[in-house]
């Protein structure tokens, strides 16, 4: 059975929302807590959380996830891949999950992993209406390309080179919604009140 790892990318300096982005609350639960709760741990051989925040490291420990310190949060979106992926180099596939999709459901992530197991040569991502979102699960053959990424080039760069290898699992649009600005978070809170 293929070994699958998960990298939760909780490392960004969140320039647009300030450093407390991951602590921002929606319905009484922080974005980082929601992100960790959305990880179907039983589907993975190992889960690592890449962050520079001690409180996130502590929270990762409560979930029995490994925490990896991100020494260069200013380096851009590729950087969590660099410390996260080597910790999972013995895996056959690795899923990359962001921490600013507060409505992402763990059931959807579990279904994504199950879909990948049926087509382990493919990159599998959540999507809606044919538009790709996160998370994405990459087979090991793409690890070298992921490790070559620099600065603000994330996994998207690799996917664009290999569109024919991409499979999308359709989920409701709300699950893919990211809150990377204070305004986006306030809009989401306002909608939740309706």
Question: Language model features by range: what are they?
Answer:
Residues 2, 144, 148-194:
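Conserved alpha/beta core of the MobA/IspD/sugar-nucleotide pyrophosphorylase nucleotidyltransferase superfamily
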Residues 1-54:
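N-terminal glycine-rich phosphate-binding loop and ensuing alpha1 helix
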Residues 7-11, 50, 97-98, 126-127, ...:
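Short beta-strand segments
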Residues 33-93, 107:
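Conserved N-terminal catalytic core of the sugar/cofactor nucleotidyltransferase
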Residues 74-140, 144-147:
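Conserved beta-loop-beta/alpha segment of the NTase-like Rossmann-fold superfamily
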Residues 18-21, 26-30, 51, 71-79, ...:
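Residues at secondary-structure transition points
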Residues 22, 46, 66, 165-167, ...:
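Conserved beta-strand segments of alpha/beta enzyme cores
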